[in-house]
């Protein structure tokens, strides 16, 4: 094998973990709230459930918390484990809601790579115009083969303190 080909191949494999991190519409890092071990492994990291928090980048004072499994073992220790797709989500209003800009139904709030092989988890937002409720959906998918694992959370827009009437999410939808 020629030296230049070997070097190119080695460089590609070294860059894969960086490429797998992804970017996306919402490039914020989630806040790790806590991890809880679910499977004990003697010499390698345990399997865990991890709970994270993220703020909606467009809707001020709405926060989402999600929990997903993180594989341990040898493959998990080196970031090579195929992560399972199970996810759960809870979003809530944490202050008076204000919108920074208009948004479309299904806009990405947050996304993150979950494996070396193009699986990602993402949170998207919608607006139930009739009920004035923001609806958040988290799901995990692969580049080729999607996943039915998902969870939904609804945030009714309510008055906060002396702020008066809450904004109507329908007024902020791109049409």
Regions found by a protein language model. Give the residues of each.
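Generic structural motif
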Residues: 54-56, 69, 94-96, 141, ...
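N-terminal secretory signal peptides
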Residues: 27-88
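Low-complexity intrinsically disordered segments
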Residues: 30, 98-175
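C-terminal segment of classical bacterial N-terminal signal peptides
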Residues: 16-24
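Bacterial N-terminal signal peptides that target proteins for export
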Residues: 1-11
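An N-terminal low-complexity intrinsically disordered segment enriched in acidic/polar residues
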Residues: 10-14, 45
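Mature extracytoplasmic domains of secretory-pathway proteins
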Residues: 61-128
